[in-house]
Amino acid sequence: GYSSAASDVYKRQIETTLDRPGYNMYCPTAIIMPSNLRDSIWGKEDDACALENIFLAAHSYGVGSVWINQLQNICDTPAIRDILNDFGVPADHVVYGMAALGYPDPDTVIQPKERIGKVAYIE
């Protein structure tokens, strides 16, 4: 694992590179970061399938999850590549998405979805 100080440095670097002040990647307890070869024809789709299975598994254990895709276009930015190298992501890989995982706030009230019972067909 990485120290809290190292995690803070990584978060600040991502925030700065994205030019999104205050961006905290949803304050996850953990992040799962699949990657794939840059030249892989189905790399993005393979990563999406892996992430969806991670989300389903997390949900089955009561763990909240959210997709984070901000790294896919900045993987080759030197500061971000340094972070990816630290995590062991090969230089010829792209991170198309990440799973941020954590426990939902128990005080959050989830509003029921309104079911209107209609289907719209567009031809």
Q: What residue ranges belong to the model's regions?
A:
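A generic local secondary-structure boundary/capping motif
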Residues: 20-23, 55, 85-89
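Short, structured secondary-structure boundary patches
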Residues: 79-93
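Small-aliphatic-rich amphipathic alpha-helix that forms the alpha element of a beta-alpha
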Residues: 32, 37-83
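Single conserved hydrophobic/aromatic residue that forms the stacking wall/gate
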Residues: 1-6, 10
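C-terminal helix-cap and adjacent tail motif
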Residues: 89-123
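Short, charged/polar surface micro-motifs in flexible loops or helix N-caps
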Residues: 8, 38-40, 105
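Helix-adjacent hinge/juxtasegments
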Residues: 12-39
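Short gly/pro-enriched beta-turn/loop segments at secondary-structure junctions
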Residues: 25-28, 60, 94
